[in-house]
Amino acid sequence: MARASLIQPGLWALLLLQAVGPAVAAKLNIPKVLLPFTRATRVNFTLEASEGCYRWSSTRPEVASIEPLGSSEQQCSQKAVVQARLTQPARLTSIIFAEDITTGQVLRCDAIVDLIHGIQIVSTTRELYLEDSPLELKIQALDSEGNTFSTLAGLVFDWTIVKDTEANGFSDSHNALRILTFLESTYIPPSYISEMEKAAKQGDTILVSGMKTGSSKLKARIQEAVYKNVRPAEVRLLILENILLNPAYDVYLLVGTSIHYKVQKIRQGKITELSMPSDQYELQLQNSIPDPQGDPARPVAVLTQDTSRVTAMQMGQSNLVLGHRSIRMQGASRLPNSTIYVVEAGYLGFTVHPGDRWVLETGHLYAVTIEVFDRSSNKVYPSDNIRIEAVFPAEFFEVLSSSQNGSYHHVRAIQSGQTTISASLTSVVDQDGGVHVLQVPVWNQQEVDIHIPITLYPSILTFPWQPKTGAYQYTIKAHGGSGNFTWSSSSYMVATVTVKGVMTTGGDTGLSVIRAHDVQNPLHFGEMKVYVIEPSSMEFAPCQVEARVGHTLELPLTISGLMPGGSSEVVTLSDCSHFDLVVEVENQGVFQPLPGRLPPGPEHCSGVKVRADAQGSTTLLVSYTHGHVHLGAKITLAAYLPLKAVDPSSVAVVTLGSSKEMLFEGGPRPWVLEPSKFFRNVTSEDTGSISLSLLGPPASRNYQQHRVLVTCQALGEQVIALSVGNRPSLSNPFPAVEPTVVKSVCAPPSRLTLMPVYALPQLDLSCPLLQQNKQVVPVSSHRNPLLDLGAYDQQGRRFDNFSSLSIQWESFRPLLASIEVDQPMQLVSQDDGNGQKKLHGLQTVSVHEASGTTAISATATGYQQSHLSAAGVKQLRDPLVPVSASIELILVEDVRVSPEEVTIYNHPGVQVELHITEGSGYFFLNTSTQDIINVAYQDTRGVAMVHPLFPGSSTVMVHDLCLTFPAPAKATIHVSDIQELYVRVVDKVEIGKAVKAYVRVLDFYKKPFLAKYFTFMDLKLRAASQIITLVTLDEALDNYTATFLVHGVAIGQTSLSASVTDKSGQRVSSTAQQIEVFPPFRLIPRKVTLIIGAMIQITSEGGPQPQSNILFSINNESVAAVSSAGLVRGLMVGNGSVLGVVQAVDAETGKVIIVSQDHVEVEVLQLQAVRIRAPITRMRTGTQMPVYVTGITSNQSPFSFGNAVPGLTFHWSVTKRDVLDLRGRHHEVSIRLSPQYNFAMNVHGRVKGRTGLRVVVKALDPTAGQLHGLGKELSDEIQIQVFEKLRLLNPEVEAEQILMSPNSFIKLQTNRDGAAILSYRVLDGPEKAPIVHIDEKGFLVSGSGIGVSTLEVIAQEPFGTNQTVLVAVKVSPISYLRISMSPVLHTQHKEVLTALPLGMTVTFTVHFHDSSGDIFHAHNSDLNFATNRDDFVQIGKGATNNTCIIRTVSVGLTLLHVWDVEHLGLSDFVPLPVLQAITPELSGAVVVGDILCLASVLISLGGVSGTWSSSAGNVLYVDPKTGVAIARDAGPVTVYYEIAGHLKTFKEIVVVTPQKIVARRLHATQTSIQEATASKVTVSVGDRSSNLLGECSSAQREAIEALHPESLISCQLQFKQDVFDFPARDIFSVEPGFDTALGQYLCSVTMHRLTDKQLKHLNMKKTSLAVTASMPSSRTSVEKVGAEVPFSPGLYANQAEILLSNHYPSSEVKIFGAVEILENLEVRSGSPAVLASVKEKSFGLPSFITYTVGVLDPTAGSQGPLSTALTFSSPATNQAITIPVTVAFVLDRRGPGPYGASLLSHFLDSYQVMFFTFFALLAGTAVTIIAYHTVCAPRELASPLALTPHASPQHSPHYLASSPTAFNTLPSDRKASPPSGLWSPAYASH
């Protein structure tokens, strides 16, 4: 019991957590467990939770223990076993608790252990059938109260079969039943039953089976000795045979028909028939009920016992019953029975099998059944003696067989089509053969559709496999059937099929069978096979590989594949047109692969098509790759331009002795694989009259042009032919050959022509002067004209070359125009525009800027002999007849046109004039485009009239027909329809005022039309409603705008739109311009009263909505200041006016305009006195009343001083504390406001009495002048009377009433609503005016009067009793209102909150009270809520009229004002201070890398802390449980702290990138030997000294370590000076870390084990280590300040050992190291015979000391080698090295001879020295090992925080085996504190 009492407090805590904790989804499988008390066995029960992992515990393990099942590493499980452990018979309870290790949720289960009071056997039935499935019997145990035990698992029972004393008729009844074990059956028992059966025990569940028919009794008792007095449970079971009646269903018969019944028995799963009549069973007809029109004396049916046949006699019904012949069995069991209905036939029905659909297929067999139904649609049994006549049309059906009664027919459909089957029930044949014909035969017919079988074409399709699903599609054609099919595929991975029969290949290889099922009968289908095989090879078939540019080549492909099923058979695919081929062209741009593939042909299955885009050759590669399959085929292609004659195109004409270079282009080029096959051939008809030669290199591989030089040697005509191509080859089996021909003409000239040369091509029009005078041409008098001389033959063909002619030039008036000698005629071959080059003789004529007329002539006098000789002309037969030409020139000025550009409106009535001046006077006008404008030239006026025809732009070109000049005069005409209308108007106008609207009409180019066109457009401006009026103004803003005046006449919103009528009569409207007529703009409040330092926000009403922008200003800035948001702050006593201006921006000009304005008077004053605003001074006990402080006038509300800075403090008191309670306004939610916010309080009446309520208002800073006369405080006091509520003392009953305000209503509800009939009545007398009214539904309505009425409520109960309630209804005016707030806030350690948490949502409820303080049940107040500013809280309407919702959004003080609109006296003020609820307070910005320990005192009602979250986890990650936050990236973030279902607060944090990251070396005074090789560098991220912000709890510190913040930084190290040839990372390693104690990041630097080479190099030169830190994730540059860490590699000796002898008694050794080590270096010898002295000290680079080592005793070593050691040590760093010293004594064996000893003696001497040296080395090694274990044994060291190598003697035991030098620490009495740095403790010195 003592132990139990110790557990109780924890239990109550767990119970409390469970009671108040939030509801979660996890549940236990049972809330209470009832277990039986046992001694011999243990009864178990398994508890299981729905989810989670739990720790289980029991409050009383001695009653019930709990053991987890399958416990995990966290020592938790989802299941546990409860076991009864009670040792004494009693009823005791233990509580089982399960605590979720993740959420802390606690689940409970009560485990009750009690005695079994009684048992009973339960089963699903009490009847068993012989040899049927066994029956399960189970025992239920009950306690003394009748409760059922949860389990009896493990409890042993004795089951026995006893004789049934009641079964008198059964012999040996106890042998009729058998008890089975589950092991003998096929059923799975509970696990504990299996275990008990293995131990030959019986549990609470058994199986029994019937052995023979009869009755048997089964008894079960508890074997446990404690339950020997519990009465055994008994059950009686009946074992029966399983008898069936066939048919077992109800049967419908026609009169005269019969049915044969069978009696069957089920045994061992088989059905056997009993022969009837039987000794055991008999059939009987009972309960014969004839039809009402039938004969009651006759039976409905007759049963023939011998045949078990029932014959229907008349209509009605009768029951057929199978009964026992034995009397004792008749009541013992229930045998089957059937009901027989004798009915009249109603109609016939048809069924067909298979398919049960009357859509058949020719050639198929079908079973047609004709069924008879009565009028109720019951199916009539088809007796053999009915006769149905069926008609199957012979042309459609072949009847194979039919039943005797005609109800069944076996037929075959033989022809397709539509037909009808008919049948009629005609008669019934009795047993004697008599035929009874039905008076009205029953007839029906069935329509049948017969189709031919469905066949699919083709029957087989073969496709290559491709990885892309759906690469191939094929439309399968289906023939036969109804024509409407459903398609299916046997393997959708191989091929799929759509509803239209489109087959699509899948992604696998194999076979798919496609089936088309007839929709009208799915049993009918056709099928075909689709093979998808894997391709194995691919090649191109022989084809043409050369093509003209623009032509297409078809390249056929032959693709083979492997048949599926593992066969190696290779077959050519017949169709691979959709093969997923990759076509690649080596030279891009020559051939373009075309989409699509070639259709399959006899020699190919697919192919690609390419188009020749440009001449050239390329290689085309077609490949296919997927997995292990890679196919490819390559072919070379060539493209060529068509061979054509370029110059001349058909005929070339030259003079004798001239030549023509004929140009041909295109044709096939040399075949790239065999260029030698290329050829060109040129021929002529007569080789003697012309000379032919091919130009260009003959071996060129790039034949794009072919030049043939033709020279005229005799007059006449010749045909010249050129052919180009390649000869056939293996790679080009079908080459292309291109031929072409031209004619060459050699003739004398017959005429010459002279024409002026124009700078630009002119129109094909002649000058009228030229037509009149034939050779008169006007030219400009300012430019030298160029004359073109041309020659023509007799047929009028122009000569291609006439250079062999001799030409003479002449001018008739050289003063106007002359031929200069220095400007001879230039012979130029020019293109005539179609690629033909003709020879032109160009002669320049010099003009002298004078007007007039002159003539120029040219004459061909003969041939030039030099040309004839060069051409090889043999003989000139006829001399040339001279030919000449002349031209007359008129010199004039150039033409001009104006205006040069104009835009006109497309309207028939619009025209524009173009003025044409200067020129020759002969003009031709045309336009650049057709159908845009119509131009008419009036030559008499010199004006061109332009009329618009169609929208667009056109250029009018004025051509001077008689003047050559560079270009015609031009004027650009823009014709445009109306593109859009643009309305510009200010979108806001105050009612009663006006603004101007401007309208422009824009053309296609968004340019405005001239206003003169508006008359053609019918421009109108309209408003959508009548709230504005429009007046057209005559004033013009410019030449493009129409102006209107817009008057606002009514408030609202409307739109303005302008419209015009275009050329076609259609109205074109502008975009509607929204315009708002707004009410006068008003600022609220109309007057502002403030004290100095107080603040209020001015809001507005009216004005445009939404208000785009309001600018506030004040006329007296010394009195008050106003912000852009309208916040007014009092500065000094005085008056001012705040002006609010509503502005808008003009959409077109961008200027700001004033839409409306208003002003508010501001008064800043000092508080002269204060008053307590109390709505009543007499209040009833138990009621509440709000009070607040005001000034002496009504304007001086809490809004005037409640938020002043510096503030006022309010101190409240009462003279009698027991009468009144003073409570803060937020007392109900556990917020205690500071005195600065207590201008409003709640007064609670406690006991009757009279007391004074006093307030003292103090100024925090009297010098601020907030109180009158710089006073320090003001006060006020009122008296309040508290009185008791009237009560009845005798009798002591409560008299309640309904309190309502005038004109309010309430719906009354009772606890009898819906159960009783309620009536309501007001009991006022007839002479009294009713105060309230109530209707029959309980709606109680008060009038405008006040008073008291009595209401009667009567409930008429359904059981006859009436209940009556009389209630007083008081109608009273509202005296005051009071505000309350919810929800209640809870803190962790009952801390007092002083403000609302930031981010919290609270609900304010307004309560209404009468003059006594009672709360109204109904009211009609219309409440308004307002705040003095809107930037700290957000306010909104609540669910009801008397509530509002406020959400705190920023830190600061807001004042809330609530008032009744109709009753100005009903108001209240509440302060709403808002503070952060999340700590810590951050003085500056958070930098990336900072760690915050966030905390909040807020908890849930159950004491559970909330969860943390972050709006941006990538910026600031927050641990949801502990509140640890890590700044990971820069940016703004919001941290949320949420108590689920209660509140949610937040804190806004800005994370910035640190400006710098500073690393500092951490100085430590003492470390252990394990730390001797490491140095730590602290890293400060940002400007703070610590990156850990806030007070961190132990749990938060653990969370920080788990989050690994050090992953945010990385550490780098390098030598400060680059003096080594290896990087610092070869010597040192660095790891980042974070120290929660320091609140800083760390870089731990560790020195590696050094090699001898590294050790030597580090001692030769000196530098330090620079350690820096960075943030890899930083996207901006960050200043990095590194830390300098000095290090020392340790001592190093230039000798590994010293060998001394009597011949060499001394030696030198150098010890290298740092200066600070060497300055205090000490040496110690292991033997007094050996001494070391300093010879030299060098503290430069490198630093070393040279020691002389000598032997003091010359005889040392004479008795044997002397082995010792020198130890060099530094007390500053605890470093030491040991050098072995060996002293040997060597005898001198040299004789006195001149050459010393003999060779033998030298050998002996040498052998002796070698032998001695060997033993000396052995001794030295022994000394080294001894020194190692002596000096380097582990001990506690006082070493600095130094970076040294990791290798220590205990870490590298093999190190000294290869080096005789070792590191030794100094004795403890010589330890010293060295300077901080990095030191090396142990290295070899070689």
Swiss-Prot record:
InterPro entries: Big_2, Ig_NUP210_4th, Ig_NUP210_6th, Ig_NUP210_9th, Invasin/intimin_cell_adhesion, NUP210-like, NUP210_Ig1, NUP210_Ig15. It is found in: Nucleus, Nuclear pore complex; Nucleus membrane; Endoplasmic reticulum membrane. Residues 1-25 form the signal peptide. Residues 1829-1886 are cytoplasmic. The chain crosses the membrane at residues 1806-1828. Glycans are attached at residues 337, 484, 681, 1039. The modification Phosphoserine is found at residues 1839, 1873, 1876, 1880, 1885. The keyword Nucleotide-binding does not apply. Residues 26-1805 are perinuclear space. One of its GO terms (cellular component) is nuclear membrane. Residues 1078-1151 form the BIG2 domain. The modification Phosphothreonine is found at residue 1844. It is a single-pass type I membrane protein. The keyword Signal applies. Residues 1866-1886 are annotated as: Disordered. GO terms for biological process: mRNA transport; protein transport; protein-containing complex assembly. GO terms for molecular function: structural constituent of nuclear pore. N-glycosylated, but not all potential glycosylation sites may be used. Contains high-mannose type oligosaccharides. Phosphorylated at Ser-1880 in mitosis specifically; not phosphorylated in interphase. Keywords: Endoplasmic reticulum, Glycoprotein, Membrane, mRNA transport, Nuclear pore complex, Nucleus, Phosphoprotein, Protein transport, Signal, Translocation, Transmembrane, Transmembrane helix, Transport. Belongs to the NUP210 family. Forms dimers and possibly higher-order oligomers. Nucleoporin essential for nuclear pore assembly and fusion, nuclear pore spacing, as well as structural integrity. This is Nuclear pore membrane glycoprotein 210. It comes from Rattus norvegicus (Rat).
